[in-house]
Amino acid sequence: MGRKARLYCESQVYHVIMRGNNKQNLFYEDSDRYLFIRRLKKYTEELQIDVYSYCLMSNHVHILIGKANMNMSKLIQKLATSYAMYFNRKYERSGHLFQGRYKSETVDSDEYFKTVTRYIIQNPIKANLEDIRNRKDEILKKSYED
């Protein structure tokens, strides 16, 4: 029996979390992170999805997105598949890179939007991972300013 399709609303904002399988690292080098970011940018532009913030931790990723509609599943599928193929080829491995299905939470208020944005930005700082701080580069079409 297949899984139920997720229902999304175009006007809604979502906090998406993608985890490494068995808590394994998703990124070993900055070049891995840059490739993931370039692909995120490519697919969000292609599918007309807004990215408000994101954070690449060693073994998981946070992305705050809007205008997802039915394209959020397509975005994650394209992103996860293409990155896993790159990663497996580069590091001479096989099998699943990501742990099961991605998680997504509806961000249903301005206050929660602020809370999630703060969490995403502070996540690497709290984990003492200064080298992978939330990167505010060309992918951010919009940013939230207090």
Language-model features: locations:
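Short catalytic/metal-binding and nucleic-acid-binding patches
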Residues: 1-146
